[in-house]
Amino acid sequence: LNEAAARLGVSLRQTEDELTRDMLASTAAFINCTAGVNGDNPTELTRSDVDDVVRALLGNNAYTILDNIEGEDKFGTAPVRDAYFALCHTDLTKDMDSVDGFIQKNQYPSPMNALRSEWGAIGNLRFLVSSIGSITQSASNLGANVYNIFCVGMEAYACIEQDGKYCCL
């Protein structure tokens, strides 16, 4: 019974994640990546695109969600800035690894402070990956899939239950 209850709990949380993803996809303002070199629109993710998003969040007085991780005297590590969340699909992990300034989670001075789904950080964005991340099929100018990355600050949205129905604001 306990195992079945635990599995149902996981299923519930995944359903809530899918509902939240769909809500964000239908309501969020967007900034297309344009600094890449693949000849498509939107392009692949670059550091310049990340900087544009961070400037937009700062310009709208968004509060960061996570505190910085101070640097330590350890080989192969780098300090991590205060950060917003960037929620994305697992298919983007290879692309993130090639972005200038990307810090993998295992390169944090204290990787145990990272979230389980966290892949790494670029500037003031810490990327959380999920296999149920948002994809818009054949939406680029050249017909490629567009992977949506939801970049959020603290209290950017809330999910509540009303009359037994799940709702995101």
Annotate each PLM feature.
Residues 24, 89-91:
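An acidic- and aromatic-residue-enriched active-site/binding cleft used to recognize and process polar
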Residues 1-3, 77-78, 169:
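Exposed beta-sheet edge/beta-hairpin loop segments within beta-rich domains
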Residues 1-72:
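Alpha-helical scaffold segments that mediate packing/assembly in large oligomeric complexes
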Residues 40-64, 83-84, 91-169:
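Sequence/fold signature of self-assembling virion shell proteins
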Residues 9, 85-88:
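Hydrophobic, aliphatic-enriched repeat segments that assemble into extended interaction scaffolds
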Residues 72-77, 117:
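A generic local secondary-structure boundary/capping motif
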